[in-house]
From Swiss-Prot:
Reactions catalysed according to its record: S-ubiquitinyl-[E2 ubiquitin-conjugating enzyme]-L-cysteine + [acceptor protein]-L-lysine = [E2 ubiquitin-conjugating enzyme]-L-cysteine + N(6)-ubiquitinyl-[acceptor protein]-L-lysine
Subunit-structure text: Interacts with ATP6V0C.
Chain positions of all zinc fingers (RING-type): 22-70
Membrane-spanning parts: 184-204, 211-231
Descriptive protein name: E3 ubiquitin-protein ligase RNF182
Annotated CDD domains: RING-HC_RNF182
Native species: Xenopus laevis
Subcellular location: Membrane; Cytoplasm
EC number from the UniProt entry: 2.3.2.27
Length: 246
C-alpha cells in the first residue's frame, strides 16, 4: 500500500495556474464538462469549447481545426469524447491542485480503478467499505430524450385534420365580409350626412318641400343636439362636484 501511494505521488506533476486553464474560454479545467483534451498539435482545449467548435460547423466532418495553429485533428469516433485527455492535468485536478495526491491525509482517499484494485484484496478484512459506481451520461442519449414525446395531446374521435383548414377559411371569409360591409355602411352614412345640405337645397328647388326641409335641417339639428348634450354633461359634472364637496 505504501509503495502504491508513493508511486501515485511521484506521478503527480506540479502545474501552475495558467496550465490549468483553457486558452479559449479562460475557465479552469475540471473532471466533468471541461476536461482537458489534447489535439494532434499538442495544444490543449477544454471539451466544452471543442463541442462549440464542432457545433459551429466550420470544420470538416470528423475533423477539428486547432484555433491556435489551424492544425487538423481527426476524431477517431466522430465524437469529442474520443480525443485523448491530458492525464497530467487530470491527475493534478484529482489531487486537488496541490501537486501531490491525498496520500498525506489519511482521512481522504482518491477513488481510481488502479487504486481500488490494490485496496480490494482478499486480505483486506475490514467491513467499513464504501463502493461507489459512477457512470457518465453519454452525449448520444440527449437527442433520444429530446425526441420522446413528453405530453400526449387529447384528440377527439371526430378529429379531421382536412376539414379544419376549410372551416378556418370559411370563418375568415365571413368575418372579412362583415367588416367590409360595416365599413361601407359607415362611409355611406357619412357621405349622406355631409351631402344632406346641398341635396336639401336641390329638393327645395325641385319643389319637394318636405324632403328638402328634412335634409337641410339635418346638419344644423345634429349640431344643436351635440351642443345641448355637451352643455347638459357639463352641468351634470358641476352639479356632482358641488354635491361631493362638503
Amino acid at each position: 500500500m505504501t509503495s502504491q501511494l508513493s508511486e501515485d505521488n511521484s506521478e503527480s506533476p506540479n502545474l501552475n495556474s495558467d496550465e490549468l486553464e483553457c486558452k479559449i474560454c479562460y475557465n479552469r479545467y475540471n473532471l466533468r464538462q471541461r476536461k482537458p483534451k489534447v489535439l494532434g498539435c499538442c495544444h490543449r482545449v477544454c471539451a466544452k469549447c471543442l463541442y462549440k467548435l464542432v457545433d459551429c460547423g466550420e470544420s470538416p466532418q470528423c475533423v477539428i481545426v486547432c484555433p491556435f495553429c489551424r492544425f487538423e485533428t481527426r476524431m477517431p469516433e466522430d465524437e469529442v469524447s474520443s480525443l485523448p485527455d491530458d492525464n497530467n492535468i487530470l491527475l493534478n485536478l484529482a489531487c486537488g491542485g496541490r501537486g501531490k495526491c491525498v496520500g498525506d491525509n489519511p482521512t481522504e482517499l482518491l477513488l481510481t480503478p488502479k487504486r481500488l484494485s490494490t485496496i480490494v484484496t482478499p486480505s483486506h478484512t475490514s467491513t467499513n467499505c464504501l463502493v461507489i459506481t459512477i457512470m457518465e451520461v453519454q452525449r448520444e442519449s440527449s437527442p433520444a430524450l429530446n425526441t420522446t414525446p413528453m405530453v400526449e395531446f387529447y384528440r377527439p374521435s371526430n378529429y379531421d385534420p382536412v376539414s379544419i383548414p376549410q372551416n378556418w377559411t370559411v370563418w375568415n371569409c365571413t368575418s372579412l365580409i362583415c367588416k367590409t360591409s360595416v365599413r361601407v355602411f359607415v362611409w355611406l352614412l357619412g357621405l349622406l350626412y355631409f351631402s344632406s345640405l346641398p341635396l336639401g337645397i336641390y329638393l327645395l328647388v325641385s319643389k319637394k318641400v318636405t324632403l328638402g326641409v328634412v335634409f337641410v335641417s339635418l346638419v344644423p339639428s345634429s349640431l344643436v343636439i351635440l351642443m345641448i348634450y355637451g352643455f347638459c354633461q357639463c352641468m351634470c359634472h358641476e352639479f356632482l362636484d358641488c354635491m361631493s364637496t362638503p
